[in-house]
């Protein structure tokens, strides 16, 4: 019969590999048109050609519970049980993303916990878009890494109940699995290393060359000049410069024009001159009058004699 498992197939998780799919869904697959026409007589080599024709992933859809081609090929692979190397090549295939998804689902169903973490976790770095068909027959966009995350953390994918998977930290404590390093951490390490290299280059650029050190060399045995002497010299030189400056400088014509044109300065100067002349004139007249009226004793005697003669 076409629905029987291969005689040389090994039991998986203590049971027939086809029994990993529920009986109701399995009978629907056997009755489907795609299974009868496309999956009859397929071998491990021919499954690859059918997997390359896949356009979406999904389980069953519609009221009649119709299986998708992706689910039919999954059951066919459980039936013929291809070798592990073929499944690994399915997962490593980067050209056909649905071939990769088919191999990942089969590895999750049949592989050990160590194999699942080893071969499926690298697919977290695949961010390509894929189409998924839900129960209503509608297509939904999702990414490869989302599908892989569901395989490792969900209980049911594509309407298939997944076997129990041992926790990762348990395998790490038992030293059966190394800690996972994400691509983001690797990028951060690269960025940090590049920043450190740039800082080292900047430090090397800041270090002065030996020629520069020779130029800036100073004899430490010679005493330094005190800042007070410098200050005194600067003060002693400043008056000379100030005394020389007015001799050298010539009055600018702009200042003369400004003085001649400004009426306020002219008025103030004329007032100062008048005030000075007034202040000087009373003293001068008083001294003159005092000299004219003040007579010597000889003159006073002569005038007294003349007055007597006139009276006589």
Swiss-Prot record:
Output compositional bias ranges, type Basic and acidic residues.
Answer: 203-224
Compositionally biased region (Basic residues): 225-294, 301-312
Where does this protein reside within or beyond the cell?
Answer: Nucleus
Q: Which GO biological process entries does UniProt record here?
A: mRNA splicing, via spliceosome
At the top level of its lineage, which domain of life is listed?
Eukaryota
> Where is the signal peptide, in residue numbers?
none
Which residues get modified to Phosphoserine? 11, 193-194, 209, 226
Segments for region (N-terminal protein interaction domain)? 1-179
Q: What is its main location?
A: nucleus
Keyword vocabulary terms for this entry: Coiled coil, mRNA processing, mRNA splicing, Nucleus, Phosphoprotein, Spliceosome
In terms of InterPro entries, this protein maps to: PRP38, PRP38_C
Q: Which Pfam families match?
A: PRP38 (PF03371), PRP38_assoc (PF12871)
Q: Which residues form a coiled coil?
A: 170-204
**Region listing for Disordered, in residue ranges:** 181-312
Cellular component annotations (GO), alphabetically ordered: nucleoplasm; nucleus; U2-type precatalytic spliceosome
Q: Where is the composition biased (Acidic residues)?
A: 184-202
UniProt lists the family membership as follows: Belongs to the PRP38 family.
Q: What binding partners and quaternary form does the record give?
A: Component of the spliceosome B complex. Interacts (via N-terminal interaction domain) with ZMAT2 and MFAP1.
Function as written in the Swiss-Prot or TrEMBL entry? Involved in pre-mRNA splicing as a component of the spliceosome.
What name does UniProt use for this protein?
Pre-mRNA-splicing factor 38A
Question: Which species does the entry assign this protein to?
Answer: Mus musculus
């Amino acid at each position: 019969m076409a629905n029987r498992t291969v005689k040389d197939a090994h039991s998986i998780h203590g049971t027939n590999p086809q029994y990993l799919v529920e009986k109701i869904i399995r009978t629907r697959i056997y009755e489907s048109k795609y299974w009868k026409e496309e999956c009859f007589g397929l071998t491990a080599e021919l499954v690859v050609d059918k997997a390359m024709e896949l356009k979406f992933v999904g389980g069953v859809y519609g009221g009649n519970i119709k299986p998708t081609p992706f689910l039919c090929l999954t059951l066919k692979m459980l039936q013929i049980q291809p070798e592990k190397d073929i499944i690994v090549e399915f997962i490593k295939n980067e050209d056909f993303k649905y071939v990769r998804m088919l191999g990942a689902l089969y590895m999750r169903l049949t592989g050990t916990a160590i194999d699942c973490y080893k071969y499926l976790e690298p697919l977290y770095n695949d961010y390509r878009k894929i189409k998924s068909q839900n129960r209503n027959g509608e297509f939904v966009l999702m990414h490869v890494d989302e599908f892989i995350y569901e395989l490792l953390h969900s209980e049911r994918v594509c309407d298939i109940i997944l076997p129990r998977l041992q926790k990762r930290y348990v395998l790490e404590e038992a030293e059966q699995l190394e800690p996972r390093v994400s691509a983001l951490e690797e990028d951060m390490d690269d960025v940090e290393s590049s920043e450190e290299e740039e800082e080292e280059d900047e430090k090397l650029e800041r270090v002065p060359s030996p020629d520069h050190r020779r130029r800036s060399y100073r004899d430490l045995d010679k005493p330094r000049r005190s800042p007070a002497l410098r200050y005194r010299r600067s003060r002693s030189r400043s008056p000379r410069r100030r005394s020389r400056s007015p001799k050298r400088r010539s009055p600018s014509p702009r200042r003369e024009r400004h003085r001649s044109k400004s009426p306020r300065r002219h008025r103030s100067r004329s007032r100062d001159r008048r005030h000075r002349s007034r202040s000087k004139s009373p003293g001068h007249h008083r001294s003159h009058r005092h000299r004219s009226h003040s007579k010597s004793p000889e003159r006073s005697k002569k005038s007294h004699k003349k007055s007597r003669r006139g009276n006589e």
